[in-house]
Curated annotation (Swiss-Prot):
It comes from Bordetella parapertussis (strain 12822 / ATCC BAA-587 / NCTC 13253). Belongs to the heat shock protein 70 family. This is Chaperone protein DnaK. Residues 632-641 have a biased composition (Basic and acidic residues). Gene3D superfamilies: 1.20.1270.10, 3.30.420.40, Actin, Chain A, domain 4, Substrate Binding Domain Of DNAk, Chain A, domain 1. Induction: By stress conditions e.g. heat shock. GO terms for molecular function: ATP binding; ATP-dependent protein folding chaperone; unfolded protein binding. Keywords: ATP-binding, Chaperone, Nucleotide-binding, Phosphoprotein, Stress response. Pfam families: HSP70. Residues 606-641 are annotated as: Disordered. The gene is dnaK.
Length: 641
């Protein structure tokens, strides 16, 4: 049975792990790194770069290099948070036909799940290279505060990447799994997972209990902000640099896409450096130019300055912590451990704030970049039956309900309800002889339905004529273990049951997913073709170099016509190298190999002659040095005793 891998699909970085020989193994990618930047670049020649190669060329290709796409997944274009990102991102965010936020590259519209699928494909390939077998199943993590649309979109991304997503698991819960299974402490423990990543923030209160030798992880509550993370911290630094440069040089860098990409890189680097040093210098020569000539950027930033810039962002993480503690029905003093997850938790000011709120030092024995993927791999091993000593009880992060008379949100399933769960409630008609009802499903905590996230709507038709309030329509909400919602309705009067799944007012249709799966497969073929082409070019290049070298050494031993023939074949191969396809290059390589045959024979003959000369020399050296030695006869003389 093939392994179920665990993937942490992050806003900034992604990570893949697997349970191998009973131990969690974080798998290194082709570049030798344990995490992969969640960056996808679409090149002019049709090639798609993912991870570090995409990040390296971002400065020169800002419009076609997509990063932090997770912030758009499952979101509407008109949402306030998306509108804010439109002004900040160098790439183009556009409105899809269904109202979702998509991106545009080379004039082609792409859905965020399609872009995320490229990252997942790299994670899949990384795992396959390590395991030496095909991988088709995965557990993928999402922020605990992701809503239904965002979870559905993440699942779609997995399908487009050629993965069957066995489970969508919340990131803090995954980190708790990775932490809890390592620990030898006995007895029940309540832990807090504070997860501040590249684009999202989550906090979960989790109880770890030993129930008859089985480790039970029960999520008591969760809260967060899906638009708060390291990207926002970077933006504060970028804004500061722009304002300082404008003061100093009178030039506004915010309109210069190339400069912005360089600033983003520098801001991220400065932020990381200031976690371990008190001061850093941002040095960007030739950042821009005006009539007076090129301008250089040189700016010192202290840790204190950075902390002042981001203080309000760190403060914003505390309110969700307060709400999570209250919802879990525990006191801060009941918490046994505080676990920090996500790269941003390396910032000393963040650690201080967490310590101040929870009144205890956060644990330092959990790797903030790898814990989530490790937990996902553990959950994968539970689902495959490899591990049987772990039980995970997660919750739905937001309340679910329907819109009833007067636009009120009637909650069917309260937030922090353990999943999977099912709940039914009976509703009726608002008018006499009403033939149908429209059921609108929402997710959120507001009292008025319109203030919450609309997940979809459906009609129940064919209700027999009756006075209002008489028909009985039973609505059932069913949340699966992935936190994804299914809704059905039944007319109790007629006994007629309609199984109705929400017709999502956003997200990808089945046809779109299938088309994207085909696109991804075609891409894989294209990637394979490009890899083969690169290999053919490298081999051809090596042959040209070796032939030239041999021609220099042995060329004078050839006939003039033979030499010309080889030189012509070299030129033909060089001409085709940059523009030709694999078949054309292979043909010219074959032609050069044939033309060089005589040269090879001459080289071989020369080497043979050299070898024979060396052997002769060695044989001569082995002869005795003195030829004048005379052999003497001797006779044994026996002495008388």
């Amino acid at each position: 049975m093939s392994k179920i891998i665990g993937i942490d699909l992050g806003t900034t970085n992604s990570c893949v792990a697997v349970l191998d020989g009973g131990q969690v193994k974080i798998i290194e990618n082709a570049e030798g790194a344990r995490t992969t930047p969640s960056i996808v670049a679409y090149m002019d020649d049709g090639e798609t770069l993912v991870g570090a190669p995409a990040k390296r060329q971002a400065v020169t290709n800002p419009k076609n290099t997509l990063y932090a796409v997770k912030r758009l997944i499952g979101r509407k274009f008109d949402e306030k948070a998306v509108q804010k990102d439109i002004d900040l991102m160098p790439y183009s965010i556009v409105k899809a036909d269904n109202g979702d936020a998509w991106v545009e590259v080379h004039g082609k519209k792409l859905a965020p799940p399609q872009v995320s699928a490229e990252v997942l494909r790299k994670m899949k390939k990384t795992a396959e290279d390590y395991l030496g077998e095909e991988v088709t199943e995965a557990v993928i993590t999402v922020p605990a505060y992701f809503n239904d649309s965002q979870r559905q979109a993440t699942k779609d991304a997995g399908r487009i990447a050629g993965l069957e997503v066995k489970r969508i698991i919340n990131e803090p819960t995954a980190a708790a799994l990775a932490f809890g299974l390592d620990k030898t402490e006995k007895g029940d423990r309540k832990i807090v997972v504070y997860d501040l990543g590249g684009g999202t923030f989550d906090v979960s209160i989790i109880e770890i209990a030993d129930v008859d030798g089985e480790m039970q992880f029960e999520v008591l509550s969760t809260n967060g902000d899906t638009f708060l993370g390291g990207e926002d911290f970077d933006q504060r630094i970028i804004d500061y640099i722009i304002s300082e440069f404008k003061k100093e040089q009178g030039v506004d860098l915010s309109k210069d896409v190339l400069a912005l990409q360089r600033l983003k890189e520098a801001a991220e680097k400065a932020k990381i450096e200031l976690s371990s040093s008190q001061q850093t210098e941002i040095n960007l020569p030739y950042i821009t130019a005006d009539a007076s000539g090129p301008k250089h950027l040189n700016l010192k930033i202290t840790r204190a300055k950075l902390e002042a810039l981001v203080e309000e962002l760190i403060e914003r993480t505390i309110e969700p912590c307060r709400v999570a503690i209250k919802d879990a029905g525990v006191k801060v003093s009941d918490i046994d451990d505080v676990i920090l997850v996500g790269g941003m938790t390396r910032m000393p000011k963040v650690q201080d704030k967490v310590k101040e709120f929870f009144g205890r030092e956060p644990r330092k024995d959990v790797n903030p970049d790898e814990a989530v993927a490790a937990g996902a791999a553990i959950q994968g091993s539970v689902l495959s039956g490899e591990r049987k000593d772990v039980l995970l009880l997660d919750v739905t992060p937001l309340s679910l309900g329907i819109e009833t008379l007067g636009g009120v949100m009637t909650k069917m399933i309260q937030k922090n309800t353990t999943i999977p769960t099912r709940y039914s409630q009976t509703f009726s008609t608002a008018d006499d002889n009403q033939p149908a009802v429209t059921i609108k499903v929402f997710q959120g905590e507001r009292e008025i339905a319109a203030g919450n996230k609309g997940l979809g709507e459906f009609n129940l038709e064919g209700i027999p004529p009756a006075p209002r309030g008489l028909p009985q329509i039973e609505v059932t909400f069913d949340i699966d273990a992935n936190g994804i919602l299914h809704v059905s309705a039944k007319d109790k009067g007629t006994g007629k049951e309609n199984k109705i799944t929400i017709k999502a007012n956003s997200g990808l249709s089945e046809d779109e997913i299938q088309r994207m799966v085909k696109d991804a497969e075609a891409n894989a073929e294209e990637d394979h073709r490009l890899a083969e082409l690169a290999q053919a070019r490298n081999q051809a290049d090596a042959l040209v170099h070796a032939t030239r070298k041999s021609l220099t050494e042995y060329g004078e031993k050839l006939e003039a016509a033979e030499k010309e023939s080889i030189e012509a074949a070299i030129k033909d191969l060089e001409d085709i190298l940059k523009t030709g396809d694999k078949a054309e290059i292979d043909a010219k390589v074959e032609a050069l190999s044939t033309a060089s045959q005589k040269l090879g024979e001459k080289m071989y003959a020369d080497m043979q002659a050299q070898q024979q000369a060396q052997q002769q020399q060695a044989a001569d050296n082995a002869k005795p040095v003195d030829d004048n030695v005379v052999d003497a006869d001797f006779k044994e003389v026996k002495r008388d005793q």
